[in-house]
Each structure stands twice: as structure tokens, then as C-alpha cells.
Amino acid sequence: VDNWYEVTDAVRPYNIRLFIGGHYHRNRDLRYDGIPGILMRSNLRDKDGKPGYGIYDITKDSILVYTQRIGESKKQWAAFSLAQPYYDRNGKAEKYPDFSVNTEYPNVKEQWIVQTGAGIYCSPAVEKEKVFVGDDMGYLTCYALKNGKKLWNFQSGKRIVGTPAAADGVVVFGSADRNIYGLNSKDGKLLWTVKAKSPVLGAVTIENGIAYIGASDSTFRAIDIHTGKVIWAYTGVKGYIETKPLVTADKVIFGAWDNTLYALNKADGKELWKWTGGLTRMHFSPAAVWPVAAEGKVFITDPQRAMTAINIENGETVWRTFQSMVRETIGLSEDGTRVFSKTMNDSIVCYATQGDQPCELWASN
């Protein structure tokens, strides 16, 4: 992340011996501006098909780090001194980001900032002069768009992960407490609740008074935002849903953590097609990306680092490319002629939406 130096500068004066991170794909011995750190493998099966875990042996003067693969002897792969200094506690980060680009756009200025006191995992939703944000404490908070003044908040039972949506004076969101809520956007009063059987982590799309949202109970729902009535429910999903669904003139399209992109009939929720693209591992699912559509195609990116164009009528792959090593983000130009994505290597790429072959128009670091 671009603000890493804020962390290392904050902890540098203290006697930090080791940053420890886990659930990684492999073991890594790192330095964070001189401060020792490691990333430990997850306990999932590795490339040889064996699960394993990490062991830390803390002695009087050292931290010894081992990997224990099931059925084998543990192997030490790193060690750190508890006495030897690794970095200058009065020093600074090895480098800082270059913010000089900001001087080229003097009219772009921060308007306001608020401290919520809780983690925020969803994007904000805006309706007229209000901004709605969900947080890790389960609050849906409304701020004034003009100055960031807090207008009201509503507390659900658990964290809010999916991005809310607001229209016609109603704000809709899902919560990990297994409920979908409809609130009066003016004062935050509860209008209705739709109960699910599992946490609701999906983002919301509202169109023509109908909210479209997926949950973790294998169900995708269309809900009247004024009454809370479920218009239809599709129950054929095999994984949980977190994405913001794409709503077109006659289709609702979304991905789930089951290797699948779904297209449903907008009117009745019946399945029109499913796309898997030959994906076999759940972790490669097109589930986090928010799909976009243009030129008769749906465009997605996925954790396999591919960008894909899919025929919107039949779900067949038009093209799929690994050229740019993209991952889980995609955007559409206002005129629908270009799609944009960011890569794993700090770049933005642009592709044409026309044609039946991938065409990168430009890439920028």
C-alpha cells in the first residue's frame, strides 16, 4: 500500500523485533524499512499437495522460525536476534512516495475527512446530498456530502461488508447478521428487513425501485425497495456472493465464490446462462469484480490475473487474456468504448470494448 511509511515511522521508536504475517502462499523473509518481518505460509496444501503450518521457537536471545509439513520433520528457515539491533530507531523510512504530481492539479483538494473509529470495507453510496457508509462495527452512517457532518446512523447486528445503494429516499444494505435492511435515507429509520439464512456480504444495485443483492445462503434476491417484498429469489448459487451485480435492460449478472458468473432474467430471476471459463479452483472465482458491459459483451477480471470478454446473450467466451496480469478490478468509460483495470504491478491498463480479440490501447505506471 502507498502509506506503508506511516506504519514503519510510527513503530520505529519502539523495540520492534519482528513483524509477523500469515496465510500467505509461501514463506518469505522480508524487511520493512529495515525492520525484520516474515510472511508465513497458510495451512492449506502447498504445490506438492501437503498441508503444513509454522512454528516459532522463542529463546532467551532469538526467534527461530520453522515450517512443519505434515508427515515430515520440521525445517528451520529463518532466525532473528532478540539482542542485535536491526535498524536505527531514530531513523526514517528508506524512501517515501513522490507526491509532486499533486502540484499539477491544484484544483483537486480534500474537502473533508471524518474518523469513524471502525474499519471500512465497502465503498460509499451517494444519494443527492447524502453519503452512506457501512463499517466493521455494523453501523450504516449517513454524512452530509457538502461537509462530512454526521446526520444519523443505524446499527445492524454485525459488520457491513457490501456496498450499500440508495434511491427514492431508501438506502438498502446487507449485514453479516443475516439481514437485508431498507432504511429511510432522510432519518435512518427502519422501513423493512428481509431475513437470509447466512451473512449478507453482497453489494447492492438499485434500478427502478428494485434492489438486487446476493447473500451467502446460495440465494440472489430482487427486492422492492419501498415495501421490502421479495419479487424473486434465485437459489442456484453454490458459493457466497460479495460483488455488486450488473443490471442491464433484461439481465442481472454477478459472480460468486464458486468459479461461476451468473446471468439471470431480470423479470423473474430465471437462469439464462452460467460462465466458468474452465476455472477449477474456488480462489480463481470472478467473485470480487464488479462486471461491466458494452458492445454486447460482459467484461470481468479474476484472481487468475486474466481479463475476459463474454457474450452477454449466451455466456460464451469471446476472448480471455493474461497479457496485463490484472486482478479483480474493471471499469468502463462513459462512452462504452474502453475498459480499464489495474494490475498487480502498480499499473493501469486500457482495452478496447469493440472486436472479438483483446486489444490493449495503453498502459500507464
Regions found by a protein language model. Name each.
Residues 2-57:
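Conserved beta-sheet core of the metallophosphoesterase superfamily
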Residues 105-125, 151-167, 176, 190-207, ...:
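Extracytoplasmic beta-rich repeat domains
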Residues 57-119, 125:
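A short C-terminal boundary segment appended to hydrolase-like catalytic domains
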Residues 144-148, 184-188, 224-228, 265-269, ...:
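Short loop/turn segments that connect beta-strands within beta-propeller blades
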